[in-house]
């Protein structure tokens, strides 16, 4: 089937409509939170606050910076491993995230921050919006190289909407805990993306197989994304936790789990290769699995060695998934997972949900202290019949809800994206930047060996024929090529002696 990939009319109109809609909705609904409003000084005076340091901004903004870098730099560069799709990986990730955070601020504002007819906007909102968009970036990895920017915008719109509904039910109605988003961000994002790519299955994708691989420099760029994500993941898992011990504990648990997953990833990567070599795909991705797996239980009393155990197993399962499960799913179940998000986010996300359920179910006042367990899980006087076993069940229900929302939502959105007018590329043109980007090809250069008698002459010339400014090319005698010069001796070659 021939596809029309010229987006000159469709993409600008879509972006313009979406942005104008955002402006109108923000104008109607969004207002500054009191701590971001010019009336903050009156609030300080009323509450007898003497310092601006009490403003929530100073507690939350460092975490926001780290999460923001993960979304735009970490996820963006992690997907630059494809040899001809670097522009699209970073650029389309930038596009969907920029739109997604605006829509997420509205959606989450209506569900969580709606006061007196308006959404109150603070630094906490933008952290939550980045979390929401991180789920969209995860799903993007499954369809990378196979969808148009139009499809990505539509997918982001629906995914942000479904994410917010799922998160509200899970956190506010079921009352599950998910500080680092193993269930709401990673499990939901991964299986939503996998379901979409299953619906969008391309039977002739093998025609683009030569571009569905990396080269030396593209793997290095992807490793930049890995390092950004690895360094900032403790902030990601702790950004929304309560100040104090919970946030402190979340950062420590994530730090340890990430470290453990690196060593087990290297171990398994070497084992599965016949010559014991390491696969860069494993190192770029599976080394991050510990951060995903510890997310739900990050702020719980998981213990340091428990965090190491989680990272240990996440690294193993993630690497084995890249080695064996991804090819199996593509060949047998028509799931074309470009980035292997099932192994980095899906499987570790499920592990994280289970770890959170077990940790919650075995929590006790002996470990947390009586005030600590009330503070961590909300076992208070208003929920006298609530106990740790019920919390464990809530965690499992939350995991199942995320899976169900992802699968059902992915099927619906997948069929919407399958419509033929979104400007998607043909099977033979997938994983190619030049379909949607102006790509300036490099001018190759050739090396002409230096004539030792004329050391001042240049050695690099353009790899194109030299045309002299004459009135007729026919009067220019052909110039014989300069024979190579041996550099083994300082004497000129005999061929150059007249």
Swiss-Prot record:
Chief location bin: membrane
Intervals, Extracellular compartment: 31-61, 108-124, 175-179, 241-251, 303-304, 362-395
Pfam name, any one: Ammonium_transp
Membrane topology: Multi-pass membrane protein
GO cellular component: apical plasma membrane; basolateral plasma membrane; plasma membrane
Matches recorded under InterPro entries: Ammonium/urea_transptr, NH4_transpt_AmtB-like_dom, RhesusRHD
Tissues showing expression: Expressed in the forestomach and the fundus of the stomach. Expressed at the level of villous in duodenum, jejunum, ileum and colon. Expressed in kidney by connecting segments and collecting tubules (at protein level). Expressed in testis by seminiferous tubules.
GO biological process, any: ammonium transmembrane transport
Localization in the cell: Apical cell membrane
Modifications made to the protein after synthesis: N-glycosylated.
Source domain of life: Eukaryota
Gene3D superfamilies (alphabetical): Ammonium transporter AmtB like domains
Swiss-Prot/TrEMBL keywords: Ammonia transport, Cell membrane, Glycoprotein, Membrane, Transmembrane, Transmembrane helix, Transport
Transmembrane parts of this sequence: 10-30, 62-82, 87-107, 125-145, 154-174, 180-200, 220-240, 252-272, 280-302, 305-325, 341-361, 396-416
UniProt topological domain (Cytoplasmic) ranges: 1-9, 83-86, 146-153, 201-219, 273-279, 326-340, 417-498
Glycosylation sites: 48
Reactions performed catalytically: NH4(+)(in) = NH4(+)(out); methylamine(out) = methylamine(in); CO2(out) = CO2(in)
One Gene Ontology MF term: carbon dioxide transmembrane transporter activity
Family: Belongs to the ammonium transporter (TC 2.A.49) family. Rh subfamily.
Assembly: Homotrimer.
UniProt function note: Ammonium transporter involved in the maintenance of acid-base homeostasis. Transports ammonium and its related derivative methylammonium across the plasma membrane of epithelial cells likely contributing to renal transepithelial ammonia transport and ammonia metabolism. Postulated to primarily mediate an electroneutral bidirectional transport of NH3 ammonia species according to a mechanism that implies interaction of an NH4(+) ion with acidic residues of the pore entry followed by dissociation of NH4(+) into NH3 and H(+).
Protein name in the entry: Ammonium transporter Rh type C
Species of origin: Mus musculus (Mouse)
């Amino acid at each position: 089937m021939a596809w029309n990939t010229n987006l000159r009319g469709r993409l600008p109109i879509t972006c313009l409509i979406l942005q104008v809609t955002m402006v109108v909705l923000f104008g109607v609904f969004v207002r500054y939170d009191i701590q971001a409003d010019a009336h903050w000084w009156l609030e300080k005076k009323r509450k007898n606050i003497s310092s601006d340091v009490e403003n929530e901004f100073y507690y939350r903004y460092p975490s926001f910076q780290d999460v923001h870098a993960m979304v735009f730099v970490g996820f963006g560069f992690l997907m630059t491993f494809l040899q001809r799709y670097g522009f699209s990986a970073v650029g389309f990730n930038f596009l969907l995230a920029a739109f997604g955070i605006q829509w997420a601020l509205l959606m989450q504002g209506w569900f969580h921050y709606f006061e007196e007819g308006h959404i109150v906007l603070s630094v906490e909102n933008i952290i939550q919006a980045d979390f929401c968009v991180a789920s969209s970036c995860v799903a993007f990895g499954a369809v990378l190289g196979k969808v148009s920017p139009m499809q990505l915008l539509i997918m982001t719109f629906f995914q942000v909407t479904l994410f917010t509904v799922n998160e509200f039910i899970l956190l506010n109605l079921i009352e599950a805990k998910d500080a680092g988003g193993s269930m709401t961000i990673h499990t939901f994002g991964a299986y939503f993306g996998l379901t979409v790519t299953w619906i969008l299955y391309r039977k002739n994708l093998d025609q683009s197989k030569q571009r569905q691989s990396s080269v030396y420099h593209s793997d290095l760029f992807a490793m930049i994304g890995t390092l950004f994500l690895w360094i900032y993941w403790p902030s990601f898992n702790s950004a929304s936790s309560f100040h104090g011990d919970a946030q402190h504990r979340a950062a420590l648990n994530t730090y340890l789990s990430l470290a453990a997953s690196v060593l087990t990833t290297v171990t398994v990567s070497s084992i599965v290769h016949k010559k014991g070599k390491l696969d860069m795909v494993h190192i770029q991705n599976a080394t991050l699995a510990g951060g995903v797996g510890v997310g739900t239980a990050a702020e719980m009393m998981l213990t340091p060695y428990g965090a190491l155990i989680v990272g240990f197993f996440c690294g193993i399962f993630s690497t084995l998934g890249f080695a064996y499960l991804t090819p199996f799913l593509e060949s047998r179940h028509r799931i074309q997972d470009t980035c292997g998000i099932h192994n980095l986010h899906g499987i570790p996300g499920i592990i994280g949900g289970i770890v959170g359920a077990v940790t919650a179910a075995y929590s006790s006042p002996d470990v947390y202290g009586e005030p600590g367990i009330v503070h961590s899980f909300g076992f208070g006087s208003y929920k006298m019949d609530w106990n740790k076993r019920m919390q464990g069940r809530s965690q499992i229900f939350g995991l199942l809800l995320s899976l169900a929302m992802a699968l059902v939502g992915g099927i619906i959105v997948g069929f919407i994206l399958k419509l033929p007018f979104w400007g998607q590329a043909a099977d033979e043109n997938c994983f190619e930047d030049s379909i949607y980007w102006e790509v300036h090809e490099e001018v190759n250069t050739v090396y002409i060996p230096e004539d030792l008698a004329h050391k001042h002459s240049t050695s690099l010339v353009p790899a194109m024929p030299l045309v002299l400014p004459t009135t007729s090319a026919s009067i220019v005698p052909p110039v014989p090529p300069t024979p190579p010069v041996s550099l083994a001796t300082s004497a000129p070659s005999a061929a150059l002696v007249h």
